[in-house]
Design a protein with these regions (language model features):
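A charged, well-structured terminal subsegment
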Residues: 99-107, 170-201
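Acidic, Ser/Thr-rich low-complexity intrinsically disordered segments
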Residues: 214-253
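A transmembrane-helix-recognition feature enriched in membrane-embedded lipid enzymes
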Residues: 1-27, 51, 59, 75-84
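A cross-family acyltransferase "interaction/gating" segment
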Residues: 124-189, 212-219, 225-226
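Catalytic core of membrane glycerolipid acyltransferases/transacylases, capturing the structured
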Residues: 32-93
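Catalytic-site beta-strand/loop segments enriched in glycine and acidic/polar residues
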Residues: 104-132
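Hydrophobic/aromatic ligand-binding patch that stacks against planar heteroaromatic rings
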Residues: 55, 80, 103, 134-138
């Protein structure tokens, strides 16, 4: 029954209604109603997990997400991680989390993965890591491309939260399942192409005000271009590494 997960489902569904968020779903029949699958999700916001989870819920499935291990430092989040089947990932040593994810997939669960790893400031697809493709190959399960669009208006990098009763529309679209090839590069390329096609289709049907920060530059928005976003991310990573080095130096004193 998983009482904590059930409580989360009720709470998230209730909160979605309370703030007037309108979620439109497409292609949910592509999420299998039984058996394992990797759900490959684009990453544009801090809250795109909840429309993705609700999409699985529409299919009477519970999605197990992979989440960076630092989130365990937050007590309430750590409690939820332990009781919702979430898989913590140490980005510097992720083999253990990978093995758990493959085990869950083989056991018939669906695992949500962000192949971009971090939020895309450009709101375009970044380069993919190989984890999703490798999991699908090793567990012998399909990959379902899933696009979430609109949640970046609620809370994304470099911008304040916008979580009140704003009635922000969100679109969730699932594409046909893909099956992993022996070549990880080939699988990644096919997955990225499928997700990019689906993303563009969803974007074309969504209203985008000119100049809005959450709209990609190619669509008339003011979001960073892919190259500009890459520069920002490199600076962010460098600053994070500097702070980590400072902490480690202090701990050795």
């Amino acid at each position: 029954m998983e009482p904590v997960f059930r409580t989360l489902e009720i709470a998230v569904s209730g909160a979605t209604r309370a703030i007037g968020t309108r979620i439109t779903y497409y292609g949910l029949e592509n999420i299998p109603d039984r058996g394992g699958a990797v759900i490959s999700i684009n990453h544009t916001s801090y809250v795109d997990w909840f429309p993705a989870a609700l999409a699985a819920y529409q299919r009477h499935r519970r999605m197990r997400f992979m989440i960076k291990t630092e989130m365990q430092d937050v007590k309430i989040v750590n409690f939820l991680i332990k009781h919702s089947g979430t898989i913590p990932v140490d980005r510097r040593a992720g083999a253990g989390a990978y093995a758990i994810a493959v085990e869950r997939l083989r056991a018939g669960e669906i695992v949500g993965v962000y192949p971009e790893a971090t939020i895309s400031r450009s709101f375009e697809l970044k380069e993919f890591k190989t984890g999703a493709a490798r999991m699908a190959r090793d567990a012998e399960v399909p990959i379902v491309p899933l696009i979430v669009w609109g949640s970046q208006r609620m809370w994304t990098k470099d911008h304040p939260r916008n979580m009140g009763r704003k009635k922000i529309p969100i679109t969730v679209a699932a594409g046909p399942p893909l099956y992993a090839a022996e070549s990880i590069d080939e699988t990644n390329a096919a997955m990225r192409e499928a997700m990019n096609t689906l993303l563009h289709k969803v974007q074309e049907e969504y209203p985008h005000p000119e100049g809005a920060y959450w709209v990609p530059r190619r669509m008339g928005g003011s979001a960073p271009t892919i190259d500009e976003a890459r520069v920002l991310e490199e600076a962010e990573l460098a600053e994070r590494a500097r702070k980590r080095a400072e902490r480690e130096a202090k701990s050795r004193r």
